[in-house]
UniProtKB/Swiss-Prot annotation:
Protein source organism: Homo sapiens
UniProt-listed SMART domains: IGv (SM00406)
Signal sequence extent: 1-21
Pfam family, one: V-set
Protein name: T cell receptor beta variable 12-4
Start and end residues of each Ig-like domain: 22-115
Disulfide bond recorded as keyword: yes
Gene Ontology cellular component terms for the protein in this record: plasma membrane; T cell receptor complex
Coiled-coil intervals: none
Amino acid sequence: MGSWTLCCVSLCILVAKHTDAGVIQSPRHEVTEMGQEVTLRCKPISGHDYLFWYRQTMMRGLELLIYFNNNVPIDDSGMPEDRFSAKMPNASFSTLKIQPSEPRDSAVYFCASSL
């Protein structure tokens, strides 16, 4: 398999492990084959009511994907298509899933929390 083909079937997703606000994300780096599921996890700061998921690409810059208030999704208008989903089952945990992953999903993904 040529390097161009390998590049096209690989997907690189980067997340910030710790932000200045003290939010914890995992995994720090994710490389997957095209078509696989990617799950990103976020632990907001204790006591914060709002959680935000963002995506940053070189071409489009920073984009808000979705945000929650007290575990309830408020605005998900930035979520691309049906392949992306986000949940916040409790105040201390959220996930962002991409399935199936595509090369155009390569980006830096991160979450933030706020009072």
